[in-house]
Amino acid sequence: MERLDIAEAYKFWDTLRDGNQLTEIRLIANDGRTASGIFDNVEDLIRCVKPYTNDWNVYYTINRLPDDARGLPQYNKIIVRPKQTCNDNMITLRDYVCVDLDSIRLSGTNATDEQVNYTQKKANEVYQFLKDNGFNPCVVAKSGNG
């Protein structure tokens, strides 16, 4: 079964990208290998990432990269073990701030219903705080394990 949900890839692009804004895709294999690709359109991203989705975990940048990142070797393709990847110093503008809330529990365990409810309550408080303090509407997501 293929793990790439193409509709979700388009949803990501339409929600978090601005036109032909660059995005780095970082891939991490179970054996520790890394790969990187830099894309400015979703069709190339999907085509290049698709072969990796069954055996690699896929991550992406949410904030803006400089236009000259198009000059890196992994522009519009995936390179395994690249010499250079994007880093925090390359971010030119922060469009998003990611807030990750997790319950305190043993590593490798799922949250109890009580922990999920508590974390949801905290997430609602954070959401309201951001809204009350002038932040743009939030993108809210919930993982499957609490």
Residues covered by each model-derived region:
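DNA replication initiation on ssDNA origins
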Residues: 1-96, 101-109
